[in-house]
Amino acid sequence: MADSKKRYLGIDIGSTTFKAVLLSEDGKVERTVYKRTQPVEAGKVACTGHCSGCGACGGGASKRLALEFLKVAGITSFKDIAAIVVTGSQIVEDTRKFIPFDFQVSEVTAHVAGAKFLHPDVDAIIDCGGQDSKCMVYNPTMKLWTSMMSGVCAAGTGSFLDSVAAKLGVKIEDVAEKVNYDSDTEFSSVCAVLSATSINKFKNRVPIGDLLAGACKAQARTILNSVGQLLLNAPGRKILFQGGVAFNSAVAFFLKKLTGSEIVIPQYHEVMGALGAAVIARQLHDLRDSGKLDLAKVEYEPTRGKSVTLRIKATRRDFFSSDKSKPLVWRNL
């Protein structure tokens, strides 16, 4: 390292983006990165059910992105980081072969930690990413955070707006400035497919600003329909809106209009999960240094629930290689 100061790394690997935050010894954000990930090229991955560590998959790509991120900060190795904590939907047990993390935390834990780091008094959070939406609300009576995650529909996620922007030929970063905020155009907020069908039907008859307004309103309604019920008992409270979708201020505008609450888009909103992971990494290092926690005695072994194991056994299909000696890949169908 260029100096003896300790740094803490938080990494959040989601379905569409790679996020990382480097935190200094005194708790300041030194660097951040928010980068869209790319699908693995066909034919490059040849694993046979077990990770070979070749690095051709998403795990290898994440390692390369993380090392590039650290290199800009003058750090050449993961060994120069005091503690690494990871989170995100794409973190799997084989991720450790590529990124030697010390601890893994849930997305909810990471997002709350990041939000409280910047806004200590926060008690309501909406996070909207590429794959799902989450709502987290603090219950002062029970002194704990309650959370809710959206279902499988893409309508309340960043992927929906990506597809709408592509369909209309608009760059996703230009959507907010092209929205007609006075438009009364409405689209279905029940299903992403129905919304896309409606947009396709009207795109040659309705101004693009109205179409984008309808899409952003549909997105805001879907977020609230899927996870917003946690906010029903506390109308008018300040809500932190974070995640990649918060780049689109139009969605925040319609969330405010629908809820009547103050919607705050915090600094580092796009990397809040990674920021929370970095904050936890700093806390983890302090506990380890003080002797209150010995990670060497904690066995890291992700386990799946019994019901999930039974379902996988019941639905697995083996696709055999040409010599029939072992599966080429395993699929859950």
PLM region descriptions:
Residues G88-I91, A218, L231-L258, H269-G273:
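Glycine-rich phosphate-binding loops at beta-strand->alpha-helix junctions
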Residues Y8-G60, L144-S147, G151:
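Short glycine-rich, Thr/Ser-proximal phosphate-binding strand/loop in the N-terminal lobe
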Residues V137-M142, S150-G151, G158-V193, R288-G305:
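A short helix-loop
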Residues S195-Q229:
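Adenine-nucleotide phosphate-binding core of ATP-dependent small-molecule kinases
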Residues T37, H50-A56, A73-V108, W145-T146:
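Short beta-strand-loop/turn "lid" adjacent to the catalytic site in phosphate-handling enzymes
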Residues Q283-L333:
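Acidic, glycine/GT-rich loop-and beta-edge segments that sit at the periphery of enzyme/chaperone cores
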Residues F101-V108, K256-L275:
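Conserved phosphate-binding/catalytic loops in two-lobed NTP-binding clefts
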Residues A2-D26, V122-T141, L333:
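Gly/Thr-rich phosphate-binding beta-strand-loop-beta motif of the actin/hexokinase/Hsp70
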